[in-house]
Amino acid sequence: MSDGNTAAAWVPTGSVTVRVPGKVNLYLAVGDRREDGYHELTTIFQAVSLLDEVTVRNADVLSLDIVGEGADKLPTDERNLAWQAAELMADHVGRAPDVSIMIDKSIPVAGGMAGGSADAAAVLVAMNSLWELNVPRRDLRMLAARLGSDVPFALHGGTALGTGRGEELATVLSRNTFHWVLAFADGELLTRKVFAELDRLRRAGDPPRLPGPGPVLAALAAGDADQLAPLLGNEMQAAAVSLNPGLRRTLRAGVQAGALAGIVSGSGPTCAFLCPSAAAAVDVGTEVSGVGVCRTVRVASGPVAGARVVPAPTEV
């Protein structure tokens, strides 16, 4: 007999699987460093079709396993944001975090696509469904923001304008599908080091600042890749290239292969290339792969939905 205090007394058995996308930054303007050490950001995120699958089951204790690309590089304990998400959600509802988490990774690790944040968002959604908590979306967003600046967008998906540290989101109208080639350079760029390098470059001579995001928003609303291409911009790009000069070769290779434009996404080391069509993206991806300027190349499209429960297969 249960004493009424165990998870088994109040949650159904079974498992829940959530798919969650990686992101690219189409536009990123960085304000000066604030007193709290953060920078004020204005960014436009787009969720793209590189998806992690996160499965959560009821268990006796909290555990985390990771398979897929780059799994061996990731911690499977409290250092992992997905583990922290499970503890936070359980604490929010006054329960023990007794779940097993399995992450099947397709979002490249240390690629600047917020894969760790995506997995954390997926855990929140999966536990909400598995435990039938009915935690409202606004509360999930609040929990997500406590975990990290990129976690709320992984919940949101689609295309969004982010402000503050990037966690304050407004939905952006984005017509049509945009086609991307994502090239992941060798080496890892730590976000804090890229910000520090940007601060140094600005003290030395102030690299150019982007105009406001209005024209980018208009191009997205029009669904016009040709209109969007010259407007892609990232004020962190100069710092990322300064720390990893090989990114310059990657950007050049993508444009020479036929991309409309290329940009370092976020703090890098991912380069995102906008292509005129799905077929063109495959061609650009093949050519960039052959040049040998990056470790991995992926073709993706966006926008796609944020973290969503995968419907269980129906029995016939």
From Swiss-Prot:
Pathway info: Isoprenoid biosynthesis; isopentenyl diphosphate biosynthesis via DXP pathway; isopentenyl diphosphate from 1-deoxy-D-xylulose 5-phosphate: step 3/6
SUPFAM superfamilies referenced in this protein's UniProt entry, alphabetically: GHMP Kinase, C-terminal domain, Ribosomal protein S5 domain 2-like
Pfam families noted in UniProt: GHMP_kinases_C, GHMP_kinases_N
Amino-acid positions noted as binding ATP in the UniProt annotation, renumbered to this chain: P108, V109, A110, G111, G112, M113, A114, G115, G116, S117, A118
InterPro entries per record: GHMP_kinase_C_dom, GHMP_kinase_C_sf, GHMP_kinase_N_dom, IspE, Ribosomal_Su5_D2-typ_SF, Ribsml_uS5_D2-typ_fold_subgr
Residues forming the catalytic site: K23, D150
Reactions that this protein is recorded to catalyse: 4-CDP-2-C-methyl-D-erythritol + ATP = 4-CDP-2-C-methyl-D-erythritol 2-phosphate + ADP + H(+)
GO biological process: isopentenyl diphosphate biosynthetic process, methylerythritol 4-phosphate pathway; terpenoid biosynthetic process
Enzyme Commission number, as recorded: 2.7.1.148
One GO MF term attached to the UniProt entry: 4-(cytidine 5'-diphospho)-2-C-methyl-D-erythritol kinase activity
Keyword ATP-binding: yes
Keywords assigned by UniProt, alphabetized: ATP-binding, Isoprene biosynthesis, Kinase, Nucleotide-binding, Transferase
Enzyme class: transferase
Domain of life: Bacteria
Coiled coil: none
Function: Catalyzes the phosphorylation of the position 2 hydroxy group of 4-diphosphocytidyl-2C-methyl-D-erythritol.
Family of this protein: Belongs to the GHMP kinase family. IspE subfamily.
Protein name as annotated: 4-diphosphocytidyl-2-C-methyl-D-erythritol kinase
Species of provenance: Mycolicibacterium paratuberculosis (strain ATCC BAA-968 / K-10) (Mycobacterium paratuberculosis)
